């Protein structure tokens, strides 16, 4: 399971906050390939084309951010694929703290992102 860097940005819970984050990244031509902005923590989780540049752009725009390691999987877009991946982590005693996923209509694969208790062990 590949481990990738995820940018986590703390934002105010008000209209325009996500737009400002995205604009700061767009101004530096940084592509957002994954997004989660759920939960009461007021944190936006992002997979981006250039994590280091994203961190600098966000700091310059006045945001607090940090990098986290997450597991990003490309799974077949069919029933049972996610269940098998989750079971594999469970067998290794790795807890899934959160997850988000996306697939394009008609796509053959889905991208699943898990924040896990031990990214290094999940990668093996």
What would you call each of these model-derived segments?
Residues 1-124:
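A conserved regulatory-domain signal marking ACT and ACT-like small-molecule sensing domains
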């Amino acid at each position: 399971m590949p481990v990738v860097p995820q940018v986590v940005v703390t934002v105010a819970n008000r209209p325009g906050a996500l737009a400002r984050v995205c604009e700061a990244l767009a101004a530096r031509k940084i592509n957002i390939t994954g997004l989660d902005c759920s939960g009461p923590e007021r944190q936006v989780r992002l997979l981006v084309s250039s994590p280091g540049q994203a961190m600098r752009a966000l700091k310059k725009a006045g945001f607090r951010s940090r990098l986290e390691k997450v597991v990003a999987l490309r799974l077949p877009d069919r029933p049972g694929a996610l269940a098998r991946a989750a079971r594999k982590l469970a067998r290794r005693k790795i807890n899934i703290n959160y997850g988000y996923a996306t697939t394009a209509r008609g796509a053959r694969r889905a991208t699943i992102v898990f924040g896990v208790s031990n990214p290094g062990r999940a990668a093996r």
